[in-house]
Amino acid sequence: MGIVCKGFDGVLTEYDWAQMSGLMGNMPSVKGPDDFRVGTTIQGSTVLCEVLPGQAWAHGVMCTSNSVETVTGQLPGPGETRYDYVVLSRDWEQNTAKLEIVPGGRAERARDVLRAEPGVYHQQLLATLVLSSNGLQQQLDR
């Protein structure tokens, strides 16, 4: 089914509001410790991140996933180390959300790489991946 979001333009039911109100207060947040948890494996030069189902909240939009979602990226070139970010991106113009891996740089600088424009486009950090051409060096969860 993918990711369904409430809080963009459209109908919001009492049930939706009850679910959302329990997540308010911490920005951004997830409902439980395993919600949107990221598991990472490497196959050749491909980075595979499986994101568990759950609920996530940020800036008035609650996203619910009821199945494991997979996003992919690539390892950096030989001799390089790179910080990449697994994020839940919300797009208010398209009224959509998606999971993606955002390539970073040689140092942990999520605030300089991720978009944070609530009401326009926002990327909620789920995990930081420290990658080298040899594979996953470290994963830092939210």
Give each language-model segment a name.
Residues M1-I42:
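N-terminal alpha-helical "arm" segments
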Residues I3-Y15, L48-R142:
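Beta-strand-rich solenoidal segments
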Residues N26-M27, D34-F36, T41-G44, C49, ...:
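Intrinsically disordered, low-complexity segments enriched in polar/charged residues with Gly/Pro
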